[in-house]
Amino acid sequence: MFSHIIVGAAHGSTLYVGDMLFYAILFIVLMALIAKFAWGPVNAMLKERADRISNDIDSAEQSRIEAEKLAKQRKEALDNSHAEATSIINNAKDSGAKERELIIGNAQNEAKSLKDKAKQDIEQERADALKSAQDDIASLSIEIASKVIKKELDENSQKDLIDSYIEGLGDSK
């Protein structure tokens, strides 16, 4: 069909108007058929593809937003866990310091109590030793006095006499 056009163009001959008219009508009919039967489905396919691409883009955007939201939540959870861990550590340190102070205070109180009890025991032992020494001195003095003055005093009178003498010595110091 086109061969005579090509051959004619090569030989320098002119185109036939009838052929051109035929080709123009054929082109218009072909375009009408394409518009009637193929253009709708092709257009629908292109619209469907554009919608699918748009939906994919929207879905990807939504997924990106959700991923950012999850990342933000995880970061907040991580920050909260770091803050909570820091709080727990600080509370443990404070609790340990308070416990240490309590233990030290109790140990100091117990040491003071033991020291006071030891002082009381020492004072009691000293008083007992002093009383025992006074009794021994009184007995010894009675023996010496009875030998010196060669007379016997009853034991209570002698003790009173010696105690008053010892107290007099204690006051003079």
UniProtKB/Swiss-Prot annotation:
Species name for this entry?
Pediococcus pentosaceus (strain ATCC 25745 / CCUG 21536 / LMG 10740 / 183-1w)
CDD domains cross-referenced by the UniProt entry:
ATP-synt_Fo_b
GO terms for CC? Answer: plasma membrane; proton-transporting ATP synthase complex
Cite a single Pfam family from the UniProt record: ATP-synt_B
* Primary residence: membrane
Give a short account of what the protein does: F(1)F(0) ATP synthase produces ATP from ADP in the presence of a proton or sodium gradient. F-type ATPases consist of two structural domains, F(1) containing the extramembraneous catalytic core and F(0) containing the membrane proton channel, linked together by a central stalk and a peripheral stalk. During catalysis, ATP synthesis in the catalytic domain of F(1) is coupled via a rotary mechanism of the central stalk subunits to proton translocation. Component of the F(0) channel, it forms part of the peripheral stalk, linking F(1) to F(0).
- The question of whether Ion transport is a record keyword is answered with yes
Keywords of the record: ATP synthesis, Cell membrane, CF(0), Hydrogen ion transport, Ion transport, Membrane, Transmembrane, Transmembrane helix, Transport
Q: Per the similarity annotation, which family is this? A: Belongs to the ATPase B chain family.
Q: What is this protein called?
A: ATP synthase subunit b
Membrane topology listed for this record: Single-pass membrane protein
Leader sequence residues: none
Record gene name:
atpF
Q: State where the protein is found.
A: Cell membrane
